[in-house]
């Protein structure tokens, strides 16, 4: 089933047809509506977020805020259908064979003696997918400079910088992304990715785009996995027709 947004209302474009004896058709009603309504809701929300991002990659980051494990995992599936390039939900990745993507947490940084050591250790572990979270202490005075230091050391050691960059998770994302982009470019890393998270939705992403932000990758969690501004999908299951059936018999009395 596919969905679209018309005006301010979510609408179903295609229909599911169930042909069955009435009792059997009624038995599956609740299951069908539960599955279709929830996942159509999340897929629709995701498509709006992806549209606002204007072609940038959207990662589903919502498991911790979803309404339970099942909603988080099936919601991740729906988000992939809606246009996400990956999910942080490892179980969803295993069950549905979709890309698992993510970075590290602030707690990773704080568990090391200093930010540089945390970055260096992470880069040693994941050299081909090295996105460093730079806002634990001070984004522009500490985080970005330490990330640049690690990237420089990787390049000098001959380690291919195949996919690398930084993630912003707080503050004025438009301003910080512009400053960080300038610092990365001047250090010789024009292809470094700038990713962002922090309670994003399609409206905030659109606003950041209008402000000329330098973010090209987005991690969207709470608003996507819960469809926070529109928390239910009004799909219905209705009886459309009842077909009469003929009775065939070889009993002459019945024929009369």
What are these regions (language model features)?
Residues 4, 67-69, 214:
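General structural signal for secondary-structure boundaries
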Residues 182-187, 192, 200-250:
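Gly/Ser/Thr/Ala-enriched C-terminal appendages of enzymes
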Residues 5-6, 81-82, 218-220:
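Short glycine-rich loop/turn motifs that provide flexible caps or phosphate-binding loops at active sites
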Residues 1-7, 248-256:
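Single conserved hydrophobic/aromatic residue that forms the stacking wall/gate
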Residues 135, 169, 216, 229, ...:
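Acidic side chains
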